[in-house]
A protein has these predicted regions:
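Structural motif
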Residues: 39, 62, 134-136
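Central antiparallel beta-sheet cores of small beta-barrel/beta-sandwich binding domains
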Residues: 42-126
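Short polar/acidic secondary-structure junctions
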Residues: 32, 45-47, 118, 129-131, ...
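Short aromatic-glycine motifs in intrinsically disordered, low-complexity regions
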Residues: 85-91, 138-145
Length: 158
């Protein structure tokens, strides 16, 4: 049985054109220099419209992000604030509000971070992953385990 398994592994490597230790052609691997650092469009979960531009920066080897611009803000509210936030973020202006922090690189994703949802003021655990050659960011916010959460996709501003 073990002999058959070894033969199957060797045949798979030969057919893929890879040698042991290589990534098979077409496999997803993010280049080391490609990171989420930059500007991202965020979207409303219900309408699908762009809501803000978030800038992600590297801070002491970790990633963090803040709202840089609101898209189509309420014209009656000239300085929207995070009214549902708690702690240091309570009542702070949305523009400049830190909504991502403490993300550390783990192979092809950034994990262990936190994300603030300014709509409800809650902080969630967060993992992010680059997709589509760095043009799309998968943002997963969750409580406890990653399966208990929701995913948003942000698009890189080019």
């Amino acid at each position: 049985m073990l002999y058959r398994l070894i033969n199957l592994c060797v045949a798979t490597l030969l057919l893929s054109g890879s040698t042991p230790g290589q990534i098979a052609p077409g496999a997803s691997q993010i280049p080391a220099e490609l990171t989420p650092v930059g500007h991202w469009r965020t979207f409303d979960d219900v309408t699908g419209k762009v809501t803000s531009i978030v800038v992600i920066r590297e801070e002491n080897g970790k990633l963090g992000g803040e709202i840089e611009k609101l898209v189509d803000p309420d014209p009656a509210d000239h300085n929207p604030r995070c009214l549902r936030c708690e702690g240091d973020a309570k009542g702070k202006p949305l523009i400049g509000l830190r909504i991502l922090w403490n993300l550390r690189r783990d192979t092809d994703q950034w994990t262990g971070g936190r994300i603030l949802d300014p709509d409800n003021g809650k902080v969630y655990r967060c993992d992010i992953t680059l997709e589509d050659r760095g043009r799309r960011l998968r943002v997963r916010g969750f409580i406890g385990f990653s399966v208990l959460g929701r995913t948003q996709y942000w698009l890189r501003v080019e």
